[in-house]
Amino acid sequence: MNKDLTVGSPSKVLWQFCLPMFGSILFQQLYNIADSLVAGKLIGENALAAVGNSYEITLIFLAFSFGCNIGGSVIVSRYFGAKDYNTMKTAVSTALIGTVVLCGALMAVGLLGCRSLLVLIRTPAELMADSAEYLDIYTLGLPFLFLYNVATGIFTALGDSRTPFLFLAVSSTANIAVDVLFVAAFDMGVAGVAWATFLCQGVSCVLSLWVVARRVRAVPSEGERVWFSWKMLGQIAVVAIPSILQQSFVSVGNIIIQSVVNSFGASVIAGFAAATKLNNVLISSLTTLGSGISNYASQNLGAGKNERVRAGFGAGVKLLGSICLCFTALYLLAGRQLLMLFMNSPTGEAINTGLTFLQTIAPFYLLLAFKLTSDGLMRGCGMMGRFMATTLSDLFLRVVLAILFSGWLGVNGIWLSWPVGWFVGTLLSMVFYRTSIHRQAEEKTTL
């Protein structure tokens, strides 16, 4: 069901629109968490470390996938908000075609270069074979990942956040069952974990494309439809490329940090891998909700309702802030128990590593509510330069400080780089929001 985000109370609209997205990303995270849970519990600590080590590299592919999602979603939602449905349909098909071409190129790069990247990040010898096998299978499934994410972006652009939630609920649950089947029953090891994700994402991709095609066809439009437009691809790229670069830089930064962590041994890698999975449940949730705020801003911008864009800030901070506080309490109170879920016979070093990481960063989660709400509004309004600046400042500080602090304070020094980077990034985001979107809406209101 398509939904118009340009009418109704901004708070109510955002909560109703974004909560299914929050549920969706929780189920999306089940893919990665299930992989790590099964690897750690049914195979061993080294298998958990191998999957976690590979995960940082898969984030590069996810960065491109997320950029395609955002680029298509923001442009489609803008034309949907303006009720220019024929152009909206051109944006949908152009986004899908462009994604297929990009995905093909990335598959070739991934299959040829993943092993070299594993060597570059100083993957321990005992983890190399499993890490490489996991990455190879993951790369083969990139078309499913990319097309599914673009389809999800189209759903949210049309105001429908419930359909992706239903797809993910079913496929994520199935992924857990297939993970256990392939590893416990068929004894496929780390490869079984990867093939389970490949299979379940493939089914989700095909079904979501079928439904989105029917949904787009049902939108009334006049005139002959253009299936591909270079001009439209350019509009999508203007939004997608900064998002891809932003996410890619974050991924590269995470890989650099992973290489620093790798120098401390397999037990530290395993503990960090488990804690990162938990941390990414929140980060990915907030990022996805930020893209929902972008859709809200883009639809209202297309409809010429700038004052509603400004009103979305308070509603967004309340939504994201409430989620941040819940996760802060959860990780501080039950961090050890959650980390134990990933390990069958954990070493004390692995558990202590993960727990220290969570206890260091969780108290600062609330900063992200302000940052990602501001970023979402700026991205939805096409202010990509400012959006990138906030993210890159955060990333740069995290990478530099992780390297410096690890030399002075050991592995625990690495974790301190997160809150420092978040603080600076949040400060910049708030300044940019106040001097751009907030001021523009305020000036329009007083005219």
Model-derived regions, located:
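Short alpha-helical transmembrane segments in multi-pass integral membrane proteins
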Residues: 1-18, 76-141, 185-241, 297-363, ...
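N-terminal transmembrane alpha-helices
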Residues: 5-42, 56-71, 75, 100-107, ...
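Transmembrane helical elements of multi-pass membrane transporters/channels
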Residues: 16-35, 137, 148, 171, ...
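Transmembrane alpha-helix boundary and packing residues in multipass membrane permease domains
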Residues: 21, 25, 37, 74, ...
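Alpha-helical transmembrane segments and their lipid-water interface positions
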Residues: 28, 32-39, 62-69, 73, ...
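Helix-terminus/linker motif at the lipid-water interface of multi-pass membrane proteins
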Residues: 30-49, 118-125, 181-188, 248-277, ...
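Small-residue-rich hydrophobic transmembrane alpha-helices
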Residues: 48-108, 145-164, 271-333, 368-382, ...
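Short runs within selected transmembrane alpha-helices of multi-pass transporters and secretion channels
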Residues: 69, 138-156, 164-175, 193-208, ...
